[in-house]
Amino acid sequence: MLHSVKALRGSAIVAQDERFGFVVDLYFDDRTWTLRYVVLDTGRPMPQRSVLLEPASIASIDPGGTLSVRLARKQIEKKPDWLAERPVYLQHDMTPTGHRGDGHLRSSEIVMGCSVQALDGSLGHVADLLLDERDWTLPCIVIDTGHWLPGRRVRVAAASVGEIDWIGRKVHLALEREAILAPV
């Protein structure tokens, strides 16, 4: 089932033993468009902390957006506060063996709002990403076409993204505007 990443932000996290925190962001690999971490704000009653949950720890996402995880509260509490220093997507990604990775970890929050360029001109901006809970991929981006097709949102395969200019906040598609017609 596909889930709106935008709608998941702010969703409750239900641990094995109780409701615990909420989703702040989702981090993904910008080469494979695969979810790497769900950023959880633990909220109250303990001091506010941000921890990372791997997709393997997610048991399910209910239709209302609540994420049930395969961890108990104590297991989540033991996770380090990864965002205390700076956002993870600005750090070099660490591999499971603890070695420095290649830095392709990106924040879904940063992607949303980026302008979108088709091969033949401006298309609009990224309004949302869609998450497939079967394989934890982000197969589609949702584009608000803005002035080009007022009031329309279109779904485009993430595989059609040719390049992302993170500094200029532009997503370049390997498609022409006319090839993008499927409304969401």
Language-model features: where?
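Peripheral interaction segments used for macromolecular assembly
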Residues: 1-184
